[in-house]
Amino acid sequence: MANAISNPASFIGVHSPIAQIRIPRLCVAKGMPTPIAQRDIILQDQIQLENTCIRHAKALKEARLAFSKVRKDHSQNLIMIDALQRLGIDYHFQEETQDVLEGQYNKIFAAHQQHHLSDAALRFRLLRQQGYYVPASDVFSELKNREGKFKQELAADIKGLMELYEASQLSIQEENILDEAGAFSAHFLNCWTPHLCDHQTRIVSNTLKHPFHRTLARSTIKNFLHFYNFQGENEYIQTFTELAKLDFNMIQSIHRQEINQVSNWWNNLGLASELKFARDQPEKWCMWPLVGVTDPSLSWQRIELAKPVSLVYLIDDIFDLGGTPDQLTLFTEAVNRWEITATEDLPYHMKICFRALYDVTNQIAYKVYKKHQYNPIHSLKKAWARLCNAFLEEAKWFAAGKLPKADEYLNTAIVTSGVHLVLVHTFFLMGDGITDQTINLLNNDDPGIISSVATILRLWDDLGSAQDENQDGYDGSYIECYMKDFPGTSVRDARNHVISMISDTWKKLNQHCLSPNPFSGSFIRATLNGARMVPLMYDFDSNHNLPILQQNIKSLLFESVAI
């Protein structure tokens, strides 16, 4: 991992000729580069690559030297690791970071010592993020008074309050002290903001709105680059920011090429022209693998993962808009049998959709086998069958005008979110931790780490009873089912209940990410990034558009960092 991007030329521009560059449809929204400008950007990537590689290698060498010096300073090494994570360059230092945090964990239960609020909260958060279980009560109880309340003098420590709020996001179930810590820190940070300068207010507000653990790190790198420009007291920060700028631009170039390749695949597939009722947004769908699988060296894996993600959206639209109950039943049977001949009685658009699904899945299984010496076809087929069976169940409900019980709806809707299907593909494409135990968990159970992400996605989607762009179908929502189960419940109360469920599910997800864990650290990070991506994908405006997602696409793909 430390050398994941030592040869960026192996990722950028070697898979698709310039003549095949096509213009992403999503990226012509207001404020996006024009189609010609986008083509010029991709051309420029290749022209500037050699110089960027040289500068990046030099910056990485200097950053490693800075890390080796600062790691010996126990007053700074946690601050340094936090900076690396926020600047998006921590993947270069994974082994070194693990060594530092293991040392911190081993001594955390040593003789009782007084710590500053910010130090204690930062250590707790970094260890929890790394999978270590640190009892919250052991860390934060000493910050309370005799009445069991957080000490009032802590309210004067703005930095400490920010770290305390960040730490509270790592809470697990029945950890009341972290719930109290989150409420306490949020209250006083909000009290402070009217009295701070503009720059400080932006930092505090950003912490409250986008706590690090629940936010895609890559989407906030630019904010932290700006922030650290104001924090010059640690000279190693400047070294890290120089690397972060080069790293951001280099990975941006990789992602532009990946989206171009997926667009070419989608256009050549031809399904969009045959299924005009379905969504046609491959560039939007690409964002799932781009933010989930963050290791720059896993470029082909992201490209392949975008294919089943696209097919999930397409097949979802077929079940919502593109077939009769009998046709959908036959389609589901074909997926369960996994036979081309089973589609003979289906309409043409369903035949070609199944053929695309069949071919893509078999191709991915073959590539996984070549790379990791394991053939996952059984697991992939089973995941698709499970998804389509759930789609069919929902289609039958709504064709009959039936509104199921809330729990019954959610159990099925968690599957139709597509999260399990996508994360099964992610697991095998990444190839880390393929064991009998993990395979059995994926095939026969619904691992909590996956079902938690699926629950968060489904509830976020249903929170606004959101309709996706250009989609006219109706498939109910948890809120409607809940209000039917509990007559007299207002929409506001139902929404508050869903918000509470999302918060509780995040606690479950945090629990499932702690060690010991049968899944690899890289897969755990991918699942967490899926949960972090959800608010961007489902934050619809009144016109059923996604302005925040579009702004993130613009920032991540087309707005480079000045060096």
Curated annotation (Swiss-Prot):
Binds 3 Mg(2+) ions per subunit. One of its GO terms (biological process) is hydrocarbon biosynthetic process. Keywords: Lyase, Magnesium, Metal-binding. Mg(2+) 3 binds at E469. Its cofactor is Mg(2+). Mg(2+) 2 binds at D316, D320. A motif (DDXXD motif) lies at residues 316-320. One of its GO terms (molecular function) is terpene synthase activity. The keyword Cell membrane does not apply. It holds the Pfam family Terpene_synth. Mg(2+) 1 binds at D316, D320. Its EC number is 4.2.3.-. The Asp-Asp-Xaa-Xaa-Asp/Glu (DDXXD/E) motif is important for the catalytic activity, presumably through binding to Mg(2+). Probable sesquiterpene synthase. Belongs to the terpene synthase family. This is Probable terpene synthase 4. It comes from Ricinus communis (Castor bean).
